A protein has these predicted regions:
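N-terminal glycine-rich phosphate-binding loop and ensuing alpha1 helix
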Residues: 1-60
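Conserved alpha/beta core of the MobA/IspD/sugar-nucleotide pyrophosphorylase nucleotidyltransferase superfamily
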Residues: 2-5, 159-242
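Conserved beta-loop-beta/alpha segment of the NTase-like Rossmann-fold superfamily
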Residues: 65-140
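Conserved core of the sugar-phosphate nucleotidyltransferase
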Residues: 111-184
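ATP-binding glycine-rich loop module of kinase domains
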Residues: 231-262, 280-281, 285-286, 290-295
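Active-site acidic catalytic loop and adjacent metal/ATP-binding pocket
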Residues: 240, 368-420
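Conserved kinase catalytic-core helix
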Residues: 265-271, 291-356, 362-378, 385
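Active-site activation/catalytic loop segments of kinase-like enzymes and analogous catalytic loops
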Residues: 412-473, 490-504
Length: 520
C-alpha cells in the first residue's frame, strides 16, 4: 500500500521547559538517540515522511538528512508556529498538498514498541495509563471509537497517544479546513478525526512511551537507557547520538563544529573519519570496539600510553611562536579558570567564602587561585594533542590495524589547531582516572552542603586507582612535572563545574578546590 507519514514537529516543546532550548523536542535524547529516530525506524525505507517544521527547524532537517540519507523527507516550513493564530492544526494544514493519499499522523513525542499498521482503514492508537487527565482520550464500544474526548474525560476511556491512520484523507482535510473558526487550528488532528467516526475508526492498542513532558520523559529514558553501552554525561548545548550504525555529534556552536571537522584531518588515523557535516552537526561511522572505561586494566593502560607517544609528536617552535604559545597557555589556563569559576557562582547561586570541606578549613577559591605559579603552568610543551583525553573517549578497537581510536577530540587549544599543551592531555587523562563517568551516571556520589560546611564522597574503581598510581610513576619516569599535572587536574574540575548539572557540579567544584588547597 502506498502511504506517507506525517510527523508533527513545528512546536516549541514548552512542557519540556529548558530541555528544548537548543533543539526541537523531536531531538530530545532517549538512550543517546533522538526521539524522532524511534519513529522513523518503525517504517520501511521506501515510506516518505512529511514533516512540518518551525521551531529550531534546521536541527531536525540536518539530523534527519545526515542520519538517513537513503530515506525521503519532505520538510514543510511553517510560517506561524507560536503566538496568535498558531497551533497544531495550522501546522498540519500546511502539509495538505503533500498528503493527497492515505497517511499516518504521529506527534514527534510518541514512541511505541509494536509495529505500526498501514492506514488501510481509519484507526487511532491508544494506551492504558494511570492518569488520563493530561491527554485526549477515546471512548470505545464494540471495537470502534465512538467518541474522541477532551482532556480530563471521566469513565471508561483510553488515552489517545497522538498516533493515527487516516484512510479517508479527503474528508479529513475538508473538515480541518471547515473547522478553522471552530477549533481545528488549536485542537489539531483530533478535530478532523472526529468527523471520521461515522465512517468507523478502529482503536489500536500500543505500548506507549511519551517524551513530551518532564515526568513522562524520565520514565521513557529509564526504560530505554540500556539500549546503548556508553556513559555520556548530558550537556545543554551538546549531544552525541548513535543511529543507524553512525555517530552524530551536535553542538549549538557552529564554529565548534567547523573546527572539529577541520581538526579531524590534522589527526587523521587516530580519530574516526568524518563522512558528512552541517553547520551544527557532523557524522562518522560507528567504530567497532569497547570504550576503555568499561574494563580498564594496568596492562592495557601501559600499552595505551606507549601508543600515545606516537601521537604526541612535539612541535618545534621559533622564539616568537614560543612566546605566543605561552600567552595562549596563560589565557587558556588562568583567564578561562577565573571566568568559569565566576560562571559557576552565578549559575548555581554560590558565593566565594572560606569553607570546611570534608572537615578541613579551606580559604576562598580566588585566594587559592592567586597563589598558583601561573608562569610555570603556562610553560607548556607543544605537541599534537587530543584535548579531552579520558577513558570514555578512548576506544579499544575490535578490528582494523590500530589498537585504539580517539573520540570527541577538542576543536582547538586556545585557538590553535595544529598543536596544544601535552600537560592538558595529561591532566584530562588524570581527571578521568579520579572521576568515573560511569559511576557518576549511576549517581554513586554524594554532596552535602550546610552553610559553609561541605562533605563530598564518590565511588572509585580499584583498577582506575591502580592506573592513577602507575600514571604518576610513568610521568615521573618520563621526567614530567607531576605536581603540575595535579594542579591542572584541579583546574579542570573547577572549569567544568559550571558546565554540568547540579549536584554533580558541586562535587566537581569542591573536589577541585580541595585538591588545589593540598597543592598550593
Amino acid at each position: 500500500m502506498k502511504y506517507k507519514v506525517l510527523i508533527a514537529s513545528a512546536g516549541l516543546g514548552r512542557r519540556l521547559k529548558g530541555m528544548s532550548k537548543n533543539v526541537n523536542k523531536a531531538l530530545i535524547s532517549i538512550a543517546h538517540k533522538p526521539a524522532i529516530s524511534y519513529i522513523v525506524e518503525k517504517f520501511e525505507n521506501d515510506i516518505e515522511f512529511v514533516i512540518p517544521v518551525g521551531y529550531k527547524a534546521d536541527t531536525i532537517k540536518d539530523y534527519l538528512t545526515l542520519s538517513y540519507p537513503d530515506r525521503k523527507f519532505t520538510f514543510v516550513d511553517v510560517d506561524l508556529y507560536e503566538g496568535e493564530g498558531s497551533g497544531l492544526g495550522y501546522s498540519i494544514m500546511q502539509c495538505e498538498k503533500h498528503l493527497q493519499l492515505p497517511f499516518i499522523f504521529t506527534s514527534n513525542d510518541t514512541i511505541v514498541l509494536e509495529q505500526i499498521k498501514p492506514p488501510k482503514n481509519n484507526w487511532m492508537g491508544y494506551a492504558q495509563t494511570e492518569d488520563n487527565s493530561q491527554y485526549r482520550s477515546l471512548r470505545i464500544e464494540k471495537r470502534k471509537v465512538v467518541e474522541i474526548c477532551s482532556k480530563g474525560a471521566e469513565g471508561d476511556v483510553k488515552a489517545y497517544i497522538g498516533l493515527a491512520g487516516i484512510f479517508d484523507f479527503e474528508d479529513f482535510w475538508s473538515e480541518m479546513k471547515n473547522g478553522v473558526n471552530q477549533g481545528s487550528i488549536e485542537i489539531g488532528e483530533s478535530y478532523g478525526l472526529r468527523f471520521l467516526i461515522e465512517k468507523d475508526i478502529e482503536p489500536v492498542p500500543f505500548t506507549w512511551f511519551d517524551t513530551g513532558n518532564i515526568e513522562a520523559l524520565e520514565k521513557t529514558r529509564k526504560y530505554f537507557r540500556n539500549d546503548i553501552d556508553a556513559n555520556i554525561l548530558e550537556k545543554e548545548d551538546e549531544a552525541i547520538w548513535f543511529v543507524n550504525e553512525k555517530v552524530v555529534k551536535f553542538s549549538v556552536d557552529t564554529k565548534f563544529i567547523e573546527s572539529r571537522v577541520l581538526r579531524s584531518k590534522e589527526i587523521s588515523g587516530f580519530v574516526p573519519e568524518i563522512l558528512s557535516s552541517t553547520k551544527n552537526m557532523y557524522l562518522y561511522k560507528k567504530i567497532k570496539g569497547e570504550v576503555f572505561s568499561k574494563n580498564p586494566s594496568i596492562s592495557t593502560f601501559k600499552y595505551f600510553l606507549d601508543w600515545m607517544e606516537l601521537f604526541w609528536i612535539q612541535k618545534e617552535l621559533d622564539k616568537r611562536q614560543e612566546e605566543d604559545f605561552k600567552n595562549v597557555c596563560l589565557n587558556f589556563y588562568k583567564d578561562k579558570t577565573y571566568k568559569r569559576v565566576k560562571q559557576y557562582f552565578t549559575t548555581f547561586e554560590q558565593i566565594d567564602c572560606e569553607e570546611i570541606i570534608n572537615g578541613v578549613k579551606i580559604p576562598k577559591i580566588f585566594d587559592l587561585l592567586d597563589k598558583i605559579d601561573w608562569n610555570k603552568i603556562a610553560n607548556g610543551v607543544p605537541v599534537r594533542f587530543h584535548g579531552d583525553l579520558h577513558f570514555e573517549n578512548i576506544l579499544i578497537n575490535s578490528e582494523g590495524k590500530s589498537p585504539f581510536t580517539l573520540l570527541d577530540w577538542r576543536q582547538d587549544f586556545g585557538g590553535l589547531q595544529e598543536y596544544g599543551d601535552i600537560y592538558y592531555d595529561f591532566a584530562k587523562l588524570n581527571h578521568g582516572l579520579i572521576i568515573s563517568h560511569e559511576l557518576i551516571d549511576k549517581n554513586l556520589f554524594e554532596v552535602k552542603q550546610k552553610l559553609n560546611s561541605i562533605h563530598y564522597d564518590f565511588l572509585r574503581k580499584q583498577n582506575l586507582v591502580e592506573c592513577e598510581i602507575y600514571f604518576k610513576e610513568w610521568l615521573e619516569n618520563k621526567e614530567y612535572d607531576y605536581k603540575k599535572v595535579q594542579t591542572m587536574t584541579a583546574l579542570i574540575y573547577l572549569n567544568i563545574a559550571a558546565l554540568h548539572h547540579y549536584p554533580y557540579s558541586l562535587l566537581l567544584f569542591y573536589l577541585g578546590k580541595n585538591m588545589l588547597q593540598k597543592i598550593v
